């Protein structure tokens, strides 16, 4: 079994060694320009067109949970990968736990009003504030995939009312499920904290705009953990300035790194991190990939395959 690996920043030698230990019958090599030798599987992140074009691969593994970048490249260069070759994304590989940590810590930060206390501290004001109740702090999750399910599970332990909005109905215990555009308003009207975990598709680009934000309760919060292109940043800033939103926590942006001139840097109600909410953890990724390749070789059912038509 031949496996080729490409990632512009990862330590290729480590990955090659780890994969060969996990799959003793495989020969793994780092792909370099000009390498046209046969391969059965490819592990990639932002691969050049020529790496995959013309290859008769059994499967391609994308070294991350998001596949929007490679799907966009495939649309622009259909010769890059035959449509019959399955494409897999990393379903969890430690990302679920990281998303849980991030979401829970931020929801609790707002629930306990630590943002307000930081503002008071900056003014040297000693002023206890009224507490929020859990009943008035409903959390709504947009996107009900693997990571959305993990986040809902972790928040459930804290007793917050939970709801999710997705393409298909979910039957998660203790979580109200809303489906499609026709139920979006009802989902938003009672959502105090909006967590975005949607996939990046043509239907979801720019979805968090003034029209959507206006349907949230006054004083709501937005936590974006998905993709920067989901948010119309000017509309978000306008909602913060008007008081419609009380705060926003952003891990992703329409342009990364975020330009120095962006007003998001200086807005007092915006907190941010540099796209680190959930990163690929190599050991967990190796375990998932080696297990999935073994299942594919045996003809067993697998999970994590990308639906190219849906975009995730």
From Swiss-Prot:
Disulfide bonds: none
Keyword terms, alphabetized: Cytoplasm, NAD, NADP, Oxidoreductase
Annotated catalysed reactions: glycolate + NADP(+) = glyoxylate + NADPH + H(+); (R)-glycerate + NAD(+) = 3-hydroxypyruvate + NADH + H(+); (R)-glycerate + NADP(+) = 3-hydroxypyruvate + NADPH + H(+)
Main subcellular location: cytoplasm
Top-level taxon of the source organism: Bacteria
Subcellular location: Cytoplasm
Residues the record marks as active site: 227, 275
Presence of keyword NADP: yes
GO molecular function: glyoxylate reductase (NADPH) activity; hydroxypyruvate reductase (NADH) activity; hydroxypyruvate reductase (NADPH) activity; NAD binding
EC number(s) reported in the record: 1.1.1.79, 1.1.1.81
Gene3D superfamilies associated with the record: NAD(P)-binding Rossmann-like Domain (3.40.50.720)
Record GO cellular component, one term: cytoplasm
Summary of the function given for this chain in its UniProt record: Catalyzes the NADPH-dependent reduction of glyoxylate and hydroxypyruvate into glycolate and glycerate, respectively.
Homology family: Belongs to the D-isomer specific 2-hydroxyacid dehydrogenase family. GhrA subfamily.
HAMAP family (UniProt xref): 2_Hacid_dh_C_GhrA (MF_01666)
Entry protein name: Glyoxylate/hydroxypyruvate reductase A
Naturally occurring in which organism (per UniProt): Salmonella choleraesuis (strain SC-B67)
Upper taxonomic lineage: Bacteria, Pseudomonadati, Pseudomonadota, Gammaproteobacteria, Enterobacterales
Name of the coding gene: ghrA
């Amino acid at each position: 079994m031949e496996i080729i690996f490409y990632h512009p920043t990862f330590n290729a030698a480590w990955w090659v060694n780890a994969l060969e230990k996990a799959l003793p019958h495989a020969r793994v090599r780092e792909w370099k320009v000009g390498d046209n030798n046969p391969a059965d599987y490819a592990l990639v992140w932002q691969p050049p067109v020529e790496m995959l074009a013309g290859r008769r691969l059994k499967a391609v593994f994308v070294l991350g949970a998001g596949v929007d970048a490679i799907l966009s490249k495939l649309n622009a260069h259909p010769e890059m990968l035959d449509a019959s070759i399955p494409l897999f994304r990393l379903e969890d590989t430690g990302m679920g736990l990281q998303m849980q940590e991030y979401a829970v810590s931020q929801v609790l930060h707002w629930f306990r009003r630590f943002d307000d206390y930081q503002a008071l501290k900056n003014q040297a004001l000693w002023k206890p504030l009224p507490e929020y109740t859990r009943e008035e702090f409903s959390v709504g999750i947009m996107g009900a995939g693997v990571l959305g399910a993990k986040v809902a599970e972790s928040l459930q332990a804290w007793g917050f009312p939970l709801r999710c909005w997705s393409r298909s109905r979910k039957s998660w215990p203790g979580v109200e499920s809303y489906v499609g555009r026709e139920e979006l308003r009802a989902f938003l009207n009672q959502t105090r904290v909006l967590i975005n975990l949607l996939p990046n598709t043509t239907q979801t680009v720019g979805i968090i705009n003034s029209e959507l934000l206006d349907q949230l309760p006054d004083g709501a919060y937005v936590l974006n953990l998905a993709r920067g292109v989901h948010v119309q940043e000017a509309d978000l800033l306008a909602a913060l300035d008007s008081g419609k939103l009380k705060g926003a926590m952003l891990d992703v942006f329409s342009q990364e790194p975020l330009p120095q001139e962006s007003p998001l840097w200086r807005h007092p109600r915006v907190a941010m991190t540099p796209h680190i909410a959930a990163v690929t953890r190599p050991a967990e990724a190796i375990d998932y990939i080696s297990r999935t390749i073994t299942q594919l070789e045996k003809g067993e059912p697998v999970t994590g395959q990308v639906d190219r038509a849906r975009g995730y």
